[in-house]
């Protein structure tokens, strides 16, 4: 009771003096100080949530002004600056955090944590895919939507649907990106397969066309290759021992400096989010028609996100930690708002690292090891909307999916989410792989693009939530291992003390030189002499 009074100064004063009239101003002052302290601690969260609400209201108010495309571009400029700052910091943040994280863990811990992370990512993504397929068959989003036309949904500015790609070429691209031929080029380009059609004239007069795959470099950071290189480099520096300590300290310092830059950028997030959301609402032509036409598809996707993010993932976290998952998630409101506004897991990575370490107390070695990997390979939200989209397009074309095709959707969606681009609309590109795998046309992807700006927001939130809860689980398991090791070490020390004394007391030399007399001091003196 005395200690609790000492930690709160205003409580000590209140207990020492009777609750009379003169103490009332100090009590009011104490409340105002507590309120001010609360707002200071949660200022960034409150400002970020306010930015989302103000941005939505601003967009709704400006829709009636019929802004031109140029004016909308100017309106979105502050949000564009936020995206540029976040993307600027991704490369040093990912590389330095993974190198320092991998170098700070020993080989056994790295293998154990890596194995748990891979199992967690794989199982949660597979469960998300199964949930999405079940919801799609129950809700039937494609039933009665065969007459939809993408031109009537305001899709003129969304661009053409992605080119269909063979499944084997998609996985070959994944392997190519894992091992980039040039690390500098990997910082701003990624490998992708394109196709050229070659016409052959046979001797019989027939004309045949052959589609030849051609590997090209497209714009976009090869985050998968950089992640693998950083992990291997961190392990190699750890193996070097003293020779690698200088370089490890360099990456640690670089990482800390990067986190300082992140803390500065975070104060611009509320402004950028406000203009990002406002400009996107102004840009859409007819939101009511869009939602009513594809409402069942949007509902099925978002319901899957709510169930997986609000029930499945928290239950997994509770099963491992026996802690309240929503208390853990409450400290991550700023990253969730950033994910909702930017639609990018990679752009959310800086704020996620900062908040999960400062607000939730996750070990830096854990967060900086697992979060960059999760932002690259863990896409639970993307797997949900990809499976719903695949079943939606099948129902749109009156195709009854058999058990083999459903299994193909589950496996392909889970595998395709690994290495999917952590950028806005990145998941749409992988839907073409699923459709090709089950033999469905890809021309209906334009309908998915029409509402992707809505679904992609909850998709990104679920993606980063899965990464955060995975980091929390790994942190809890690592703490258990550390505590168990400390307990075993204490037991060894406790057992060692009486054993050493008993050996000294029963030493033949001590017994011989001190046949009689007090035995409390003599053993210690003899032992000191023998050591000297």
UniProtKB/Swiss-Prot annotation:
GO molecular function annotation: chloride channel activity; L-alanine transmembrane transporter activity; L-aspartate transmembrane transporter activity; L-cystine transmembrane transporter activity; L-hydroxyproline transmembrane transporter activity; L-proline transmembrane transporter activity; L-serine transmembrane transporter activity; L-threonine transmembrane transporter activity
Residues annotated with Phosphoserine modification: 507, 527, 530
Main location as per UniProt: membrane
Cytoplasmic side: 1-41
Segments on the Extracellular face: 140-216
Lineage top rank: taxon: Eukaryota
Residues of this chain annotated as glycosylated in UniProt: 201, 206
Stated family: Belongs to the dicarboxylate/amino acid:cation symporter (DAACS) (TC 2.A.23) family. SLC1A4 subfamily.
Function noted in UniProt: Sodium-dependent neutral amino-acid transporter that mediates transport of alanine, serine, cysteine, proline, hydroxyproline and threonine.
Record's protein name: Neutral amino acid transporter A
């Amino acid at each position: 009771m005395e200690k609790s009074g000492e930690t709160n100064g205003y409580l000590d004063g209140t207990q020492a003096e009777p609750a009379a009239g003169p103490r009332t101003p100090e009590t009011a002052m104490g409340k105002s100080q507590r309120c001010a302290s609360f707002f200071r601690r949660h200022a960034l969260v409150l400002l970020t949530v306010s930015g989302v609400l103000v941005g939505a209201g601003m967009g709704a108010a400006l829709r009636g002004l019929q802004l031109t495309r140029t004016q909308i571009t100017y309106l979105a400029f502050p949000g564009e600056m936020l995206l540029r700052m976040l993307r600027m910091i991704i490369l040093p943040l990912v590389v330095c955090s993974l190198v320092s994280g991998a170098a700070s863990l020993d080989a056994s811990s790295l293998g154990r944590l890596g194995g748990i992370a891979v199992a967690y990512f794989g199982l949660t993504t597979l469960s998300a895919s199964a949930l999405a397929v079940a919801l799609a068959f129950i809700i039937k989003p494609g039933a009665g939507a065969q007459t939809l036309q993408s031109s009537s949904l305001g899709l003129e500015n969304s661009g053409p649907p992605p080119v269909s790609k063979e499944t084997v070429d998609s996985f070959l691209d994944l392997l190519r990106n894992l091992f980039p031929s040039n690390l500098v080029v990997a910082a701003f380009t990624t490998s992708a397969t394109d196709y050229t059609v070659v016409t052959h004239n046979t001797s019989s007069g027939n004309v045949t066309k052959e589609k030849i795959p051609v590997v090209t470099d497209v714009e976009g950071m090869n985050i998968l290759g950089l992640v693998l290189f950083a992990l291997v480099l961190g392990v190699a520096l750890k193996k070097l021992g003293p020779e690698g300590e200088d370089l490890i300290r360099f990456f640690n310092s670089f990482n800390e400096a990067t986190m300082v830059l992140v803390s500065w950028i975070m104060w611009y997030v509320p402004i950028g989010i406000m203009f990002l959301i406002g400009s996107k609402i102004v840009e859409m032509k007819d939101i009511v028609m869009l939602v009513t036409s594809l409402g069942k598809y949007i509902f099925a996707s978002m319901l899957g996100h709510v169930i997986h993010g609000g029930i499945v993932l928290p239950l997994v976290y509770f099963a491992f930690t026996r802690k309240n998952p929503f208390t853990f998630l409450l400290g991550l409101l700023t990253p969730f708002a950033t994910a909702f506004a930017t639609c990018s897991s990679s752009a959310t990575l800086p704020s996620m690292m900062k908040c999960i370490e400062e607000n939730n107390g996750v070990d830096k070695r854990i967060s900086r090891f697992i979060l960059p990997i999760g932002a690259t390979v863990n896409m639970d939200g993307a797997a949900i909307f990809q499976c719903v989209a695949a079943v939606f397009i099948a129902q749109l074309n009156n195709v009854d999916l058999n058990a083999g095709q459903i299994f193909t959707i589950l496996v392909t969606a889970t595998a395709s989410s690994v290495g999917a681009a952590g950028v806005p609309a990145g998941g749409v590109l992988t839907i073409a792989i699923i459709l090709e795998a089950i033999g469905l046309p890809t021309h209906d992807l334009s309908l998915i693009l029409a509402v992707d700006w809505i679904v992609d927001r909850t998709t990104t939130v679920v993606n980063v939530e899965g990464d955060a809860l995975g980091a929390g689980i790994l942190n809890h398991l690592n703490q258990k291992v550390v505590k168990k090791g400390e307990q075993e070490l204490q037991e060894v020390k406790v057992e060692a003390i009486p054993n050493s004394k008993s050996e000294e007391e029963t030493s033949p030399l001590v017994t011989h030189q001190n046949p009689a007399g007090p035995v409390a001091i003599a053993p210690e003196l003899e032992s000191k002499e023998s050591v000297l």
